[in-house]
UniProtKB/Swiss-Prot annotation:
GO annotations of cellular component type: cytosolic ribosome; nucleolus; ribonucleoprotein complex
Post-translational modification: Ubiquitinated at Lys-103 by RNF14 and RNF25 in response to ribosome collisions (ribosome stalling).
Phylogenetic placement of the source organism: Eukaryota, Metazoa, Chordata, Craniata, Vertebrata
Pfam family membership, one: Ribosomal_S17e
Residue numbers carrying Phosphothreonine: T130
Positions of crosslink type Glycyl lysine isopeptide (Lys-Gly) (interchain with G-Cter in SUMO1): K103
Gene Ontology terms describing biological process: translation
GO molecular function terms listed in the Swiss-Prot or TrEMBL record: structural constituent of ribosome
Organism: Oryctolagus cuniculus
Name recorded for this polypeptide: Small ribosomal subunit protein eS17
Alphabetical keyword list: Cytoplasm, Isopeptide bond, Nucleus, Phosphoprotein, Ribonucleoprotein, Ribosomal protein, Ubl conjugation
């Protein structure tokens, strides 16, 4: 099993990544040198722990957003995703197939006047009332 990282190591690594993201990478040794240059870390052992956690977080950041770390690049990416407008609206299709429940919801939202709605019966999925041993 691995070791538990202290609050000091985690906070220091997060701050270093937020401020110096462009200088860091997936290599422990380069991250160790960057940590040594930018921060006053009292001991070699603590510096290595922080650099190791920085490397771990950098690998996680490459896979996707990491909770507790906001990086300008990720913020811009999220803004772009939130402001996305499709070229063709889903309502501009010739026929929109909906089930009766969806039709009712659209009526409640004042979209009942859409002329291209076609109500279809939903396909029956899994039957959950069968006993466990039966096939």
């Amino acid at each position: 099993m691995g070791r538990v990282r202290t609050k000091t190591v985690k906070k220091a690594a997060r701050v270093i990544i937020e401020k110096y993201y462009t200088r860091l990478g997936n290599d422990f040794h380069t991250n160790k040198r960057v940590c040594e240059e930018i921060a006053i870390i009292p001991s070699k052992k603590l510096r290595n722990k922080i650099a190791g956690y920085v490397t771990h977080l950098m690998k996680r950041i490459q896979r996707g957003p990491v909770r507790g770390i906001s990086i300008k690049l990720q913020e811009e990416e999220r803004e772009r995703r939130d402001n996305y407008v499709p070229e063709v609206s889903a309502l501009d299709q010739e026929i929109i197939e909906v089930d009766p429940d969806t039709k009712e919801m659209l009526k409640l939202l004042d979209f009942g006047s859409l002329s291209n709605l076609q109500v279809t019966q939903p396909t029956v999925g899994m039957n959950f009332k069968t006993p466990r041993g039966a096939v």
